[in-house]
From Swiss-Prot:
Record key words, sorted: Membrane, Thylakoid, Transmembrane, Transmembrane helix
The protein's role, per its UniProt record: May play a role in photosystem I and II biogenesis.
Protein's UniProt name: Protein PsbN
Organism: Trichodesmium erythraeum (strain IMS101)
Record InterPro entries: PSII_PsbN (IPR003398)
Listed PANTHER family: PROTEIN PSBN (PTHR35326:SF3)
Domain of life: Bacteria
Amino acid sequence: MEPATVLSISIGVMVVAITGFSIYTAFGPPSKELVDPFDEHED
């Protein structure tokens, strides 16, 4: 395989993995631990 093809595929896989992990963190079971700082702040 060409080095440019391998690099392109590697970068694409990394972007998809980071996006998937972000969606899992935002909407999956770990989202129960997330806190909204605007709800915590009182004037």
